[in-house]
């Protein structure tokens, strides 16, 4: 049932059958995003019943026979459909996963995937920022803003950030 958080329920559900290009992930951390609230409320209609969440991290516990670049035991993260990260485990197409570097925790990986994709879109695709350019970034203290400012600095851009409380 769609609605507020009071409509959420903890239930046992069967995982979908794995395909040859899928992996089974045991979640160790998940990301919480505005889009999850949109799915839950019905603002972005989704078929129900629904397991929320599009961002997570975990350990591969099973790999389909066609999966070559990932193996059981790999730490991976994702930010893409199908929904279902609000669960202990998830079947996921292997080509939608990235390995988590050893120096990044599962919690950080799960929390930055969607924000990082947003920043990549802004600083590489919307406008390909180059070293020496100046960028004004509003909401620099938010999740996207913090990643953007670090990314822009790494590129060599001069960053001017704005923040506010209202």
Feature map (PLM): residue ranges:
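NAD(P)H dinucleotide-binding glycine-rich loop of Rossmann-like/cofactor-binding domains
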Residues: 76-139
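Cofactor-binding loop segments of dinucleotide-utilizing enzymes, especially the Rossmann-like FAD-
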Residues: 1, 28, 164-165
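Hydrophobic/small residue at the entry helix of a nucleotide-binding pocket
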Residues: 143-144
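Extracellular beta-rich ligand/substrate-recognition surface
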Residues: 1-7
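Gly/Ala-rich phosphate-binding loop of Rossmann-like dinucleotide-binding domains
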Residues: 119, 149, 153
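Adenosine-nucleotide cofactor-binding segment
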Residues: 137, 153-166
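Glycine-rich beta-strand-centered segment in the early N-terminal region that forms part
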Residues: 14-31, 41-84
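Conserved hydrophobic/aromatic beta-strand scaffold that supports enzyme active sites
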Residues: 10-15, 57-59, 89-91, 97, ...
């Amino acid at each position: 049932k769609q609605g507020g958080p009071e409509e959420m329920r903890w239930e046992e559900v069967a995982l979908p059958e794995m395909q040859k290009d899928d992996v089974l992930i045991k979640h160790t951390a998940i990301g919480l995003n505005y889009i999850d609230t949109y799915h839950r409320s019905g603002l972005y209609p989704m078929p129900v019943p629904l397991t929320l969440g599009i961002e997570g991290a975990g350990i591969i516990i099973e790999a389909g026979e066609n999966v070559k670049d990932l193996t059981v035991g790999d730490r991976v993260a994702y930010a893409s459909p199908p929904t279902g990260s609000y669960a202990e485990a998830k079947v996921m197409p292997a080509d939608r996963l990235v390995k988590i570097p050893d120096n990044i925790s599962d919690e950080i990986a799960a929390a930055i995937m969607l924000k990082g994709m947003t920043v990549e879109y802004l600083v590489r695709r919307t406008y390909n920022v180059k070293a020496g350019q100046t960028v004004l970034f509003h909401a620099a203290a938010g999740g996207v803003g913090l990643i953007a400012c670090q990314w822009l600095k790494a590129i060599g851009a001069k960053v001017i950030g704005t923040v506010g409380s209202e």
